[in-house]
Amino acid sequence: MKKYKFIWTVKSECGPVRKKNEDSIFPLESGSSKTSIKAGVFDGMGGHKKGEVASDLASKTMHRDFDSITDYVKTANRDILEYQSSNDDAKGMGTTMTVVKISQDGTLSLAHVGDSRCYVLSSRNMIQLTEDENVPGYQNVLTQALGSKEKLTIQNKDFQLSSGDVVFLCTDEIGRAHV
C-alpha cells in the first residue's frame, strides 16, 4: 500500500464586499502529516444574523472524532439549530460546510452542503467534486445550508487521490471568481 505525506496551507480573509469575515476554516494553521488529515471550509451566510457564529460552530465539530465524514455535517447542523433555539438573535443564521477526510492510502471522503467547493488538481486536469446548491438564476441564494432545516441532503463522494494531486477547498467567492 502506497503511503502519502500530506502538506496543507490555509488562508482566510475578508473579501471586498463584507466588513467582517464570516468564513471559518479547519485546520487553522498550515502544517504536514504522514497520517490521515481532515479539513474543511465554512462560509457563514452573509446578510443573515450571526453567519460568523454559524461557521465557527461548524468548524469546531472538526475537533471531534467521527467514523463517518457525514457525522461532522449532521453534528454541526444540530449544534447550530440548538444555538438558534436558545438565542433569539441567532434565528436564521447558517453556513455552508465542505469537509474532507483523507486517509493514509489517499482515499478522500467528502461531505458537502451549500456552495463552497472542493477541487482536485491533478497533473492532467481539475475536477470539481462538489455541486453548488443555489436557487437557479440566483447564485447568492442557497437551497440549503447548515442551520436552515433539521434534515439536510448531504452530498457525499469518495475519490482516490494520486501522488502529487492537490485538494483545494474554497468558498463560493473564490470558486466563482478565480477557478
Where are the language model's segments positioned?
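PP2C/PPM-type serine/threonine phosphatase catalytic domain
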Residues: 1-176
